[in-house]
């Protein structure tokens, strides 16, 4: 379906109706030009089904990961503590998935308070995820490249680091909590997005560029640096066991980037276009709007993928899961002995003990 948009009022109504849940901001600049807008978007029922599956898989998988790590208290490593917090963040976000699913179908019917809270949870999940992965990369870099027991081996320091990550993630996410509002224009579904008032372009630049610089780009550079030197050390020293055990961490980082990097790149392109750093055309505007919808779904999918990684390539996770079942009498000791896979302990390899 195509709609001729000839003034700001019509455009505003169309955007709220068709892109109610897109994170991209509606164009409100004075020089906004009329466009022939293509409103064909992803099938909302398919999106609802995807969100429902993500909710179920994430709820089950991340709860299981937390149980396995909490049960293996005696041999819990520093990386396990970080991954425990990562599972907590994904589980917290998963609890909001039913709300996102309903909003795709009916618009935002939950009011402004829940609009603020759910948006805050989404951003906290994103920032805490990449900051925790950056901390893991630093820990592995110091432990393998410099072959030393880092200060983070002290359990109480790890807890303070995790608390600091949660606090920083909350600070970086506060703009979404402060500025998100629900609007219900006539003949249109209610929407939840930032109300920036005047000077929209300036505030959009601040709210997008600064948090993503400190909460995404810088942690990403830290990860690339640390894992680059870590991989070089592993290959040069022929540390076979450490290399195999590091597969889980590398897989977690790779999946995070595959899920969230496309969304952030599209969001950056949208910001540059809306602030006139790059030329804005009707075709480019429509392409970016569609890309925001698609890549946001990919980002949401991330919350259920880490447990799948642990189950398929995390030897110690499978061992910990079987051990937990045996302790509860759900499987026999003989079954545990026969099916338990060989693991690499953190004492000999200095890698995650439970995953």
Swiss-Prot record:
It is found in: Cell membrane. Neutrophils. Keywords: Cell membrane, Chemotaxis, Disulfide bond, G-protein coupled receptor, Glycoprotein, Membrane, Receptor, Transducer, Transmembrane, Transmembrane helix. Gene3D superfamilies: Rhodopsin 7-helix transmembrane proteins. One of its GO terms (molecular function) is C-C chemokine receptor activity. InterPro entries: CCR1-9-like, Chemokine_CXCR1, Chemokine_CXCR_1/2, GPCR_Rhodpsn, GPCR_Rhodpsn_7TM. It is a multi-pass membrane protein. It comes from the Eukaryota. The chain crosses the membrane at residues 41-67, 74-92, 115-138, 160-184, 205-232, 248-270, 291-313. Disulfide bonds join 115-192. One of its GO terms (cellular component) is external side of plasma membrane. Its main location: membrane. Glycans are attached at residues 7, 21. GO terms for biological process: calcium-mediated signaling; immune response; neutrophil chemotaxis; positive regulation of cytosolic calcium ion concentration; receptor internalization. Residues 1-40, 93-114, 185-204, 271-290 are extracellular. Receptor to interleukin-8, which is a powerful neutrophils chemotactic factor. Binding of IL-8 to the receptor causes activation of neutrophils. This response is mediated via a G-protein that activates a phosphatidylinositol-calcium second messenger system. PANTHER family: C-X-C CHEMOKINE RECEPTOR TYPE 1, CELL ADHESION MOLECULE. Interacts with IL8. Interacts with GNAI2. Belongs to the G-protein coupled receptor 1 family. This is C-X-C chemokine receptor type 1. It comes from Oryctolagus cuniculus (Rabbit). The gene is CXCR1.
